[in-house]
From Swiss-Prot:
Compartments (UniProt record): Secreted, Extracellular space
Stated name of the protein: Arylphorin subunit A4
Domain of life of the source: Eukaryota
Lineage: Eukaryota, Metazoa, Ecdysozoa, Arthropoda, Hexapoda
Family classification: Belongs to the hemocyanin family.
Organism: Calliphora vicina
Pfam families, A to Z: Hemocyanin_C, Hemocyanin_M, Hemocyanin_N
A GO molecular function held by the record: nutrient reservoir activity
Tissue-level expression: Fat body.
Length: 759
């Protein structure tokens, strides 16, 4: 009951309204003050609030109904639960505040008294969904809760970081290295007839620091934070000004390793544990949170159910391509009756010091978890199979749903997510959540539970079992479309339009190094000057990650007249793990849509270029927490114009993960291009600024009104499918080993970070 109150009452965070259009503009003082509050209220959110201004403000909580635009039964129940102490310690939710002052006071109160996890969850929903918060942002979730993204070894080192102790340690370490590294290669040479230095490449690639002679501890960063666009920032005088006097420290951080048991899946941990990938899934489930009803928050206008299920398919396709890179092939089939050969230990630790549960090798799905949830989930899938097979469903209220209409996939998507828009809550509500609770071995009556990665959106994608289970979820989508007729040749044909050629530039992936701001893990004393917080120390997690070089498409399209069109681009495999060509009928499930854009064709031959950095659903690295806070403070002093588009929208997929790893000699893949008339009844992104906002609930955040994944949404009849306005292009994806220079000879500056790594 307690959890039900919490989940339903969190809806009170946000007020329903449409999203109005905002020009990209410079923030005014009022906006900056709000942004400063949001940044400070989540600083070290697991520690007591240290900002005196917000402590004073948070001493009271507004329970007066007149202070809210909406006050329902769940808010009443929450208030009663709060009075009797029947809520999670330190945090549940805050209400529909009529104005910023009431909201701010309630947020400060919640920050001091309520559970920090629920507090951040609720605050995130408010910032995303309230129209009066347009442009306001929170730090990325991996900056608020770094312990959900980095292993326990790193977290412990960050939590106990002390500058004074570090200063003494680094002095002793220098004396040690001056002796050890004088002739490192000679020291190891000919021992057991091996020259160990030349075997540094035997380390997993993502243990890059060993090749530079670094250890897993803190190093002073005297130059700059590492990221793709660091050269641009290094030339910005304002950027250099805000970091003057700031001490930065980095520590190498690994992905999960094979420690106690063999797990071949760990070779993919650089992908499954990628910070950007897990952040994307987290925000997708914040944008379309299952507890928010579509009518109130406009989510139905975005086709929330279909879009959520489409994203599941996209992620599965991307994961499958990464598996092919390593020769693994199909994602294993999931069944509650099966034994999963390879276990998983996330090596994560909760902020209270309790480690996350792990899954052993030969995990018997049926033998773990609460059996009441097991039967609920099994019943859920059986019921779904029944109604899809029948093609019609009569709800508890007597409403008839025709499941042979393609647009009914919206209902199926809502059922699979278990959101409150499910067309029959009596039978289907929260079954998806129950499955995760079964995997996490918890139930709604537990007051204390062990942390488990399946209980957090930001952690669940780390486990390979996630993809197995979600493949089962996606199978419902394909089962639904088994009963929908394939597109005919006439439906796919765009008369008068022919794709003559598409030239693709070289596709190259590589591993780069990046710094993540993890200052929220620090426990040292905060610095205040005249009551104002001074961010004088920053901790950085330095990690290797997959990236790709920019690439582009050169289109050559012939048109009989001027047409406004939508051009879709998909990436998919060519061969399976055994080198066999995958038929298009089977392969349609494996194609990932990487771009869609509107273009006006002129009569005749159209020759134009599309750059990978312009893909509409991808984003580059977001500006870090530290940087954003310093920019805000500089703007409040009148020394900087703070643009609302200073950071990337939270809802984008990481641009650097568009391409799979590939092979050194080239991995065969294929692009698919398809042109269709633009027929949408709206202008995409027309009611909001997509440079910094996501337009959740606007109804105009998608390119057009065609089904997601079109034309691969339905089964394919290869006799009907091929038309002149589509084009397949065979390509190869090459992987460049950026660590190759460390293999052949000794790194001259061994024991120090190599800043020439990027050159």
């Amino acid at each position: 009951m307690k959890i039900a109150i919490v989940l339903l009452a969190i809806i009170a965070l946000v007020a329903a309204s449409s999203i109005s259009k905002h020009e990209v503009k410079i923030a005014d003082k009022e906006f900056l003050a709000k942004q400063k509050f949001l940044f400070e209220i989540v600083y070290r959110v697991e520690d007591p609030l240290m900002f005196e201004e917000w402590i004073k403000m948070g001493k009271t909580f507004t329970f007066d109904k007149s202070g809210y635009t909406h006050f329902d039964m769940y808010m009443e129940k929450f208030y009663e639960a709060y009075k009797y102490g029947a809520i999670l310690p330190k945090g549940e939710f805050f209400y529909y505040a009529k104005n910023w002052e009431t909201f701010q006071r309630n947020v400060a109160f919640a920050r001091m008294h309520f559970n920090e996890g629920m507090f951040v969850y609720a605050l995130t929903l408010a910032v995303i969904h309230r129209d009066d918060f347009q442009g306001l942002i929170l730090p990325s979730i991996h900056e608020i809760f770094p312990q959900y993204f980095f292993n326990s070894k790193f977290v412990y080192e960050a939590e106990k970081f002390d500058y004074d102790v570090w200063s003494k340690y680094i002095m002793y370490e220098k004396e040690y290295k001056d002796i050890l590294y004088k002739d490192y290669s000679t020291f190891y040479k000919n021992h057991d007839n091996h020259h160990y230095y030349y075997f540094t490449k035997d380390f997993k690639t993502y243990q890059w620091w060993k090749m530079m002679g670094l250890g897993e501890h803190w190093y002073s960063e005297d130059r700059f934070m590492l990221r793709d666009n660091m050269n641009k920032y290094n030339k910005d005088s304002k950027y250099l000004e805000i970091f003057e006097g700031t001490k930065m420290f980095f520590m190498p951080v690994d992905y999960t390793r094979d420690i106690e048991f063999f797990n071949k899946e760990s070779v993919l941990s650089y992908f499954t544990e990628d910070v950007g990938l897990n952040t994307y899934w987290y925000y997708l489930n914040m944008d379309y949170a299952f507890i928010l009803d579509g009518k109130t928050f406009g989510l139905n206008k975005d086709r929330r159910g279909e879009y959520w299920l489409y994203n599941v398919r996209q992620l599965l396709s991307r994961y499958y391509m990464e598996r092919l890179t390593h020769g693994y092939g199909e994602i294993p089939h999931f069944s509650f009756l099966n034994t999963i050969e390879h276990g998983y230990d996330s090596q994560l630790v909760y902020n209270n010091g309790v480690g996350f549960s792990y899954r052993k090798n030969y995990y018997e799905v049926e033998s773990y978890g609460k059996f009441s949830y097991y039967y609920k989930v099994m019943d859920f899938f059986n019921r779904l199979d029944e109604i899809i097979t029948k093609g019609v469903y009569v709800t508890y209220e007597g409403k008839t749903i025709d499941l042979r209409k393609p647009e009914s996939i919206e209902y199926i998507g809502s059922i699979m997510q278990g959101n409150v828009d499910t067309f029959d809550n009596y039978f289907f509500k929260y079954r998806y959540m129950f499955a995760h609770m079964y995997f996490g071995d918890v139930n709604t009556h537990d007051f204390e539970v062990f942390p488990h990665i399946f209980l957090n959106y930001e952690t669940m994608m780390r486990d390979p079992m996630f993809y197995m289970f979600y493949k089962k979820i996606a199978s419902v989508y394909f089962q639904f479309f088994n009963y929908v007729k394939p597109y005919t040749h006439e439906e796919l044909l765009f008369p008068g339009v022919t794709i003559k050629d598409v030239k693709v530039s070289e596709l190259v992936t590589y591993f780069d190094l990046v710094d993540f701001d993890v200052t929220n893990l620090m426990n040292d004393e905060m610095t205040f000057v005249d009551g104002q917080f001074v961010w004088d120390k920053t901790l950085l997690a330095r990690q290797m990650r997959l990236n790709h070089k920019p690439f582009d498409f050169d289109f050559v399209i012939e048109s009989d007249k001027s047409h406004k069109v939508v051009i879709r681009t998909f990436l998919g495999p060519k061969y399976d793990e055994f080198g066999r060509v995958i038929t298009l009928t089977e392969n349609r499930q494996n194609f990932m849509e990487i771009d869609s854009f509107i273009y006006t064709l002129k009569s005749g031959v159209n020759d134009f270029k599309r750059l990978s950095k312009d893909f509409y659903w991808t984003v580059e690295d977001r500006t870090t927490y530290n940087e954003l806070y310093k920019y805000v403070m500089l703007a409040l002093q009148g020394k900087y114009d703070f643009p609302l588009d200073i950071s990337e929208p939270h809802c984008g997929f990481p641009d650097r993960l568009v391409l799979p790893h590939g092979w050194y000699k080239g991995m065969p893949m294929q692009f698919f291009f398809y042109i269709a008339p633009y027929t949408a009844s709206y202008g995409p992104f027309s009611t909001y600024d997509s440079t910094y906002a996501c337009g959740i609930g606007s109804g105009v955040r998608h390119i057009d009104e065609m089904p997601f994944g079109y034309p691969f949404d339905r089964e394919i009849d290869e006799y009907e499918f091929f038309v002149p306005n589509m084009y397949f292009k065979d390509v190869k994806i090459y992987h460049q080993d950026t660590f190759d220079k460390y293999y052949g000879k000794k790194y001259e500056n061994f024991g120090h970070f190599d800043y020439s790594y990027y050159h």
